[in-house]
Amino acid sequence: MIKRAAEALDRGEFLQEFIPVPEDLKITAGFLGEGDAQKALEAQTKANVEKYGYGNWYDYSVGEWGTKWDVGDDGATDVHPDGKMLHTYFDSAWSPPIQAYEKLTELGFTVGAMYYEGGMSYAGVWEDGVDDYYDLGGMNSTQVAEELPVELDEAFGISESMAEYEAENEEELTEWIKDGVEQNKKLGLVSE
């Protein structure tokens, strides 16, 4: 099963390999316009919901995988020499595929995963069915270093990159203040 997983990851079809989207759901998720095409889409969507609980691929992927797109194809899969374990990394759309981790566990995999989304300020560790989620919003680099497990922080360089960002912002703010003071001196608004 590990070899199959590694091959699917390399193809960028890991989730589809183990938690496949039914063919009937591979339809447009949205609006085709007026007329017969739209009516046919609506009828197929309704039939899909009745049969699968989802109207289309998008709803299924988000519901069953936890993300809208499949994962893999990063060329980052390493199979352990004993063939019983693999290590990989991948990007996913919007969120980690938590629902997929749960389903993979049901299929017999042991899943341990770490994730980080800097733009949305969250990180976490998923292991043995437990999602340790960390909301990083409003935290500075020191707080992040204290709050996150060391392994998670180091895997993504979270507190380190935040510290660099904070230092850059401090330099820019200091320069902006100095420029403002100099400008105010030139205008006679501040005495020397």
Which residue stretches match the model-derived regions?
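Intrinsic low-complexity, intrinsically disordered or marginally ordered coil/linker segments
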Residues: 1-192
